[in-house]
């Protein structure tokens, strides 16, 4: 046993140039852990609270000095003296100290920074990798990357409504080859876009962000890039989408306004559109296909295509076991997106993954659009054998940091490493 002797937070920058929280944890034996907290652009209304200062004269109101102060002046006093390996105890103490259902008092960004830094310090204390500390001898499955190579919605300044169009190299023999395939497709996509005279600037997550005639044109363009890179769509590479539908849902009219296309759809019309798209294109995963509060629409979507396509709840479930439990009971979706900062502690994150697995739901470990060099989610993906990771295009250091960490983990696991490819979608009809 080694106790925590120091907890220190500071304000640093994320990949969008906005402030975020960095926390360091030290133990009496000299162990050390550091964690940086990510931040989202499109956020679910039920997410844990990210505490911002609100001072418009400083970082346009997005400073996090209050959260930093909460770590240094309040949380540190509570956590110092804890056994660094008592992750559940540490997280429980912070939740109780905050005392709100959404971590609104101290801030999920303050609490999460301490939670993740403590886990890293514990791994350092024991002389093991983070994935080994969290997953033990069983953590050995490298995730299929869900690579966002074409951006729209809140992640880009263009006229594409759907937020993310992704490729999944399901036919790769291992993670290393999957990453290579994704990178080659990204380069092929750039050439396709240039050939069409389209913009090759990138969005928040490293994918290209051109103006296109329709959301379907995005799918067609990616299909061409896959072929140009020398791969077979549907066999070696499948497509995935994050609609982030809450961003274009009009709650007053109850309709979906796809302004880029100049189209308005009802829930049922959205479901029909998705059904058409999965028939025409090798789409294996759709995230947030409907608004987070449109549970009737989600139920219909699940009934119509849930046996053929992974239906991921992000804003729908916000990594929250209460929301997930309700979804499981009602037969809504069949997968959950896992974002550590949506819930605010490592313990609650692992609980959500475990609940999903027990119910036959898949779990996709995810970054946020505002990221840092922190690669914790790569270790979480392997530790939990989640089988999937969503962490942007294979470009920009904030995204590549996670991919490079997975390469290191695969090397370290050597012959024990597994890559499940198509078998990742175990809850779908083959």
UniProtKB/Swiss-Prot annotation:
Which co-factor is required?
A: Mg(2+)
Q: What PROSITE patterns does the record point to?
A: ENOLASE (PS00164)
* Catalysed reaction, written as an equation: (2R)-2-phosphoglycerate = phosphoenolpyruvate + H2O
Span-the-membrane segments of this chain are none
Enumerate the CDD domains for this protein.
Answer: enolase
Coiled-coil boundaries: none
List localization entries. Cytoplasm; Secreted; Cell surface
Gene3D superfamilies to which the protein is assigned, alphabetical? Enolase-like C-terminal domain, Enolase-like, N-terminal domain
Report if keyword Magnesium is assigned.
yes
Q: Which HAMAP family match?
A: Enolase
Q: Quote the protein name from its UniProt record.
A: Enolase
Which classification does the entry list for the species? Bacteria, Bacillati, Bacillota, Bacilli, Bacillales
What gene is this protein translated from?
eno
